[in-house]
Each structure stands twice: as structure tokens, then as C-alpha cells.
Swiss-Prot record:
Family: Belongs to the TtcA family.
Something else known: The thiolation reaction likely consists of two steps: a first activation step by ATP to form an adenylated intermediate of the target base of tRNA, and a second nucleophilic substitution step of the sulfur (S) atom supplied by the hydrosulfide attached to the Fe-S cluster.
CC annotations in GO: cytoplasm
Species annotation: Shigella dysenteriae serotype 1 (strain Sd197)
Protein name in the entry: tRNA-cytidine(32) 2-sulfurtransferase
High-level lineage: Bacteria, Pseudomonadati, Pseudomonadota, Gammaproteobacteria, Enterobacterales
Protease in keyword set: no
NCBIfam families: PRK10696.1 (NF007972)
UniProtKB keywords: 4Fe-4S, ATP-binding, Cytoplasm, Iron, Iron-sulfur, Magnesium, Metal-binding, Nucleotide-binding, RNA-binding, Transferase, tRNA processing, tRNA-binding
Length: 311
């Protein structure tokens, strides 16, 4: 009996520790990109996946202690996929007591009608979903739209654009919609997918799989995701370093004339700080930038096992 109680305390301690890390990551992203401001009404897009559940949970947690006032409204788009368990999210949100809206639109039927069998449905599905969510945000008076993309999603997008699109373009933590009417934020931008997965498992969120893309295992994004996971296992710190690189761009050392005036470099031009490496090899640090040793969740401080709630 005592052993079972001890295991429960250790599991609770680890969950609290993980939640604190996710809170810290989300809080830093919100501060760095000014994602949430006084009086904001945040429309939290809830798909039924681990990422959006985690985003809603962490935002609700932060809402209780934030120095500013903001409100949340959870929105789920029921795309009328066959077998979609409509009751799952409804029951979860009712139990949670959060304001919510379920939007019903048969985008599944449109996608199946327009996209040939075996072809990727993601592009059309995303466009349809985006339009509906923008419209819903206007109806609800939302000032920000929160999406559940995390750090790994952002890196995957960068490599997808480099490998297949010939562009150095990622997924911004904050953006303005093309029509200039909506601000989209990604509060999980600094969060690791493996942390989100562990948190979702521990909280036992009622996960709902996407039937539209679940039958497309060879998507380009999945190939990139597998590559990044392999790198993370074989070369600890590489993922952190790559994400750090996205925040430390040096236009003078790339090849885009739109970002840096290479043609304007003449005798007497202003010196670019750190730019004189024409004849030298740049020194690379022994440890990857931004890397920290993985925390050993099993090495617990016995004196702190009575922690039961994150404040």
C-alpha cells in the first residue's frame, strides 16, 4: 500500500515538474512575441489532439496567475468525418467548465469530392478550415486565434520549405491573416513535442484521431518528422540548436539580396560585425547552442515528493 502511494507521489511530482516546464515555455513565448495583451479574447482552436488539449490546459493555468486579464473560448470544428465521436469534446468541455463553441461544417465531404483517391488532402482541408475559423473568430469577437503548433512543427515546416519549396521559411509564432483582420498566435512555439506527448498521456486527454490524414502515412511532413526524431536521438541538442538558429538569422551570410545589399558592398562600405570570415573557418562550440542535458525524471528529491499541485 505504501509502495503504491509512493509511486503515485512520484508520478504527481513528475507531472507537476513537466507542467511547470510547459508553463515556462508558453509564458516565454507569449512575452517574447507579445501574443496576449490586456483584455484579449483568445479563441483556442481545439482539434481533439494532444497539442490543442495541452494548449488549452496551459493557457487556463496561466490565466489564473497572469498579471493581465484575458478570456478564453474553446472552438472545435466538426468536419463531419465518418465515425467522428461528437460527444467526446462536448463532454470534456462541459466538465471543464470553459466557454466553448462547436462549429459544424461538412468539409470532409468537400475534400473527398475535390481530391482524387490517394492524393494528399491536407492543403484543401487546411484552407477550408482556416476560412471557417476566421469567420468564427469574427462572430465570437475574438481578438486572437490560438493554434497548437509546437517547436517541432515549426522546424518541420522550415525543412519542408527548404527541401521541397526552395525557401527558408518556417511557421511564425505570431502572424496577421492575409485580410488583415485576424492575429494568429502559437503559444506552444517553444514547447517540445515529447513534453506535450508526456503531458497528454499523464493527463489522459480524450484524444480524437484525424481520419482524413490518418490514412496517408507517407506524407512529406511525416518523413521530415521522422528525420528530426532520429537526429534528436543520435545527436542530443541538435533540435535545440536548429531552433536557436531560427532566432539568430544573419542575412549578410546568406544569399538573399532582398535581405542584404550585397551589390552595395564597395570600398569604404560599413563593416559588417563578425563578417570577416572569408579566409577563416568559423569556430563551432563543443556543445550545441541552446542544448541542456536531458532531465532525469527518475532522480527525484525525496523531500519534494509531497508536491501535488502547480501554483
Amino acid at each position: 500500500m505504501q509502495e503504491n502511494q509512493q509511486i503515485t507521489k512520484k508520478e504527481q511530482y513528475n507531472l507537476n515538474k513537466l507542467q511547470k516546464r510547459l508553463r515556462r515555455n508558453v509564458g516565454e513565448a507569449i512575452a517574447d512575441f507579445n501574443m496576449i495583451e490586456e483584455g484579449d479574447r483568445i479563441m483556442v482552436c481545439l482539434s481533439g489532439g494532444k497539442d490543442s488539449y495541452t494548449m488549452l490546459e496551459i493557457l487556463r493555468n496561466l490565466q489564473q496567475s497572469a498579471p493581465i486579464n484575458f478570456s478564453l473560448v474553446a472552438v472545435n470544428l466538426d468536419q463531419k468525418q465518418p465515425g467522428f465521436p461528437e460527444h467526446v469534446l462536448l463532454e470534456y468541455l462541459e466538465k471543464l467548465g470553459v466557454e466553448y463553441k462547436i462549429v459544424e461544417e461538412n468539409t470532409y465531404g468537400i475534400v473527398k469530392e475535390k481530391i482524387p483517391e490517394g492524393k494528399t488532402t491536407c492543403s484543401l482541408c487546411s484552407r477550408l478550415r482556416r476560412g471557417i475559423l476566421y469567420r468564427t473568430a469574427t462572430e465570437l469577437g475574438a481578438t486572437k486565434i490560438a493554434l497548437g503548433h509546437h517547436r517541432d512543427d515549426i522546424l518541420q515546416t522550415l525543412f519542408l520549405n527548404m527541401f521541397y519549396g526552395g525557401k527558408m521559411k518556417g511557421m511564425p509564432p505570431k502572424l496577421m491573416s492575409d485580410d488583415g483582420k485576424h492575429i494568429v498566435i502559437r503559444p506552444l512555439a517553444y514547447c517540445r513535442e515529447k513534453d506535450i506527448q508526456r503531458f497528454a498521456d499523464a493527463k489522459a486527454f480524450p484524444i480524437i484521431p484525424c481520419n482524413l490524414c490518418g490514412s496517408q502515412p507517407n506524407l512529406q511532413r511525416q518523413v521530415i518528422a521522422d528525420m528530426l526524431r532520429d537526429w534528436d536521438k543520435r545527436y542530443p541538442g541538435r533540435i535545440e540548436t536548429m531552433f536557436s538558429a531560427m532566432q539568430n538569422v544573419v542575412p549578410s551570410h546568406l544569399c538573399d539580396s532582398n535581405l542584404f545589399d550585397f551589390k552595395g558592398i564597395t570600398h569604404g562600405s560599413e563593416v559588417v560585425n563578425g563578417g570577416d570570415l572569408a579566409f577563416d573557418r568559423e569556430e563551432i562550440p563543443l556543445q550545441p547552442a541552446g542544448w541542456q542535458p536531458e532531465e532525469d525524471e527518475n532522480q527525484l528529491d525525496e523531500l519534494r515528493l509531497n508536491v501535488v499541485e502547480v501554483k
